[in-house]
């Protein structure tokens, strides 16, 4: 087990004996505002020089506060300069402070730590930082995006520093294995800090689905946790479709798949739903909760956004605190009068649990500033805004006691911090204790009493070679055997569950063995076609038509390349937004004769991005039809559809064609040659003679005869191994390469097929047989 790290960017171990600002200097009355603002902004330097923009405009602060100074300073901040109209200056920069008020660039540091992108097509933004105590290093993250649609998407990037001056890739980092080995000497406490010396922690094909990453380290579970705002490939105008996801990592470099969190934000004072834009999350041991300040908004974009407070006992399930904002824009003419932006905080413990102080560094914008005189950090109008300064970006400070803050947010003058609730028991349960190999199952974890304060759970497996369990409590069956899944909390509650891993009776049918059709489609490419559900890409979707709108119910059908005995169906909803996620459904098995039977139905699918798995009694089918009875917004969508056969999949038989010109064919009687591009290999034969025949001997298990139908044609008898197997009527509308006869399921061995004309005309194009 690795050494445990001390408090990193949880920012909860700080012991401060005096406020950073005297109470008289803080501008707001706590009876009206949850936080008291300092009268001016703080001076954060910006590296750029631009004749169209005022100097030192900055945003996206993230502040790390340590118990003891690190390389001379207890306060370290990562942030980005920013100006209106262009994003090329929005590159992560570093400052440090001894008091959280006066910020300096450490001697020898050259900002920004990440160079300006080569063109306006790309931009950096949304910085965050965490202290790694085990390695005694700072880890600075930021978001990078290719703003060109159809480009390479986005990345969460990382630079690391041992001294706060040189930021880059540690010399002990192996790029091939993505392993950062712990340095054991001063010579190893070095980084390569060139222009391209960064680590890509996460990459995505979408441009804006990992905005404002905020990272903490959990010393109890020995994991890093990242939350980010998913706005898909849209960004600023994605509106209420935004949502927050979280991931885990053992080392802060390689991250797991994201899981969407629940209830991150609620309603504002006007009853409108809030959507996230930027966030800062920390775990506060004093409260035994994850706490987040979220820059959020009601409406279509973040203009005029505010801060709200939201909390969680486990990091997954959240609850907004009241409906009042934590921080709002100031009065007209103030430096923060337009919009509160990405902000950072720490909770300073008080003399007792819940009696601490909330300290917030917040970025904000001042509006309508073009060519006007604007205030400096002391409040004096000494700065000339420039021609493209539609708004000015600054970073300021606000604070309040935690209790007073909560009294305002909850509109409860008598609020006191509730006492922490000790748990009596932790209980694990699962829908079954028998898990097939390759399958996953989510544990249910409950507490008594239900309001137990400490609900951060560490899961472990007694035998990861049999079954693994991740930080979300999701078990994966690895191999046949038995494993005990254990759960525990910081305060010592625990439980375990024995899981038997058995052979998996289901086999995934490859999507390449299926085709998809739908009763309604929108005419887009990444949003619309039924084929999108079989492309292996959850970011492309089938969508019912909405221009004009086709009312539900509507269906999407997957057809198989051969009959399968199927017993499981998986519906993967769209991953960005909820519009069209199916909530009520019917599932039909389609048989070879075209009939269909209902095999499953339901009306309780959640409007989230999680897979919906349906198991049903095994049935032989040539396809499955998913009928959307109800869906969000009255539409139907699907990102992916997958079907599982019950039992092993027999490979599709391989048919070998035998053309009419093949020397192994034996023709008797009069046969005429015919040429046409619609025939197999361009040729066929036909006979007008009753009794004329064609014969073929093969070794295999199945045989097919292909030829023409025509309104002037008659009939033939087909013999297999000398026994009449059927009479075939070839009369019908003219059509080439028609399957006229099929015999399958033959015992493997030598067989002979013979076609005899009994009523002219009879056509022969080719045989096709299954050999070895």
Curated annotation (Swiss-Prot):
pH dependence: Optimum pH is 8.0.
Record's signal peptide: 1-27
One Gene Ontology term of the molecular function aspect: metal ion binding
Catalysed conversion reaction: an N-acetyl-alpha-D-galactosaminyl-(1->3)-[alpha-L-fucosyl-(1->2)]-beta-D-galactosyl derivative + H2O = an alpha-D-galactosaminyl-(1->3)-[alpha-L-fucosyl-(1->2)]-beta-D-galactosyl derivative + acetate
Region (Deacetylase activity): 180-402
Keywords assigned: Glycosidase, Hydrolase, Metal-binding, Signal
Residue sites binding substrate per the record: 87, 123, 236
Matching SUPFAM superfamilies: Arabinanase/levansucrase/invertase, Galactose-binding domain-like, Invasin/intimin cell-adhesion fragments, Sialidases
Domain F5/8 type C, first and last residues per copy: 494-605
Regulation: Inhibited by EDTA.
Outcome after substituting residue 341 to F: 3000-fold reduction in deacetylase rate
Sequence segments annotated as region (CBM32 carbohydrate-binding domain): 502-765
Keyword GTP-binding tagged: no
Family annotation (SMART domains): BID_2
Pfam families reported for this sequence: Big_2 (PF02368), F5_F8_type_C (PF00754)
Residue span of region Not required for activity on soluble substrates: 515-772
Cofactors that this protein relies on: a divalent metal cation
Biotechnology: 5 ug/ml of this enzyme pair converts A blood type to O blood type in an hour, and can be removed by centrifugation, showing the pair can be used for production of universal type donor blood.
Chain sites annotated for binding a divalent metal cation: 126, 278
InterPro entries: Big_2, FA58C, Galactose-bd-like_sf, Glyco_hydro_beta-prop_sf, Invasin/intimin_cell_adhesion, Sialidase_sf
EC nos: 3.5.1.-
Domain description: The deacetylase domain is in the N-terminus, while the C-terminus has a CBM32-type carbohydrate-binding domain that is not required for activity on soluble substrates. The CBM32 domain binds preferentially to repeating N-acetyl lactosamine structures.
Miscellaneous notes: DNA was isolated from a male human fecal sample of AB+ blood type, the sequence was given to UniProtKB by the submitters.
Name of the protein described by the UniProt record: A type blood N-acetyl-alpha-D-galactosamine deacetylase
Organism in which the protein naturally occurs: Flavonifractor plautii (Fusobacterium plautii)
Organism placement in taxonomy: Bacteria, Bacillati, Bacillota, Clostridia, Eubacteriales
